Amino acid sequence: MLRKPKILYYSNGQTQKEKAIEKAAKRLGADFISISETDCTQTVGYLAKVKGFPVHKTSILENISAVCQDVMILCYFPNTRLDLLLASIRNGETPAVDLKAILTPQNCIWTFSQLYQELLEEHLSLFSNQE
């Protein structure tokens, strides 16, 4: 069974960029799921609507980790559509997102905030090594 590709996107308040990425998703035949600040405590699997990932009930005492940049998660993208999306980012047709990931069995159990932290650390490590 083939699953429909999805883009999960946290805009960090960048509404124009969010609209452009949503438009790119539609152009590629992918669903677009906007992630809100309150979604950041949910698992990536739940946000991507993967079976077996229930909603995480957050107490008012639970610390919501701040996600301070936009984040894109690509789910169920076949290589051909992934190549098209990356090409549209390279040619400026779709806005670039520094922190992006592909949904995997490993990261679907993480909360969105945990995945953000991992992506941020990788991004900072990659670019600090280029100096």
Where are the predicted features?
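Mid-chain, well-packed structural core segment of small domains
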Residues: L61-G92
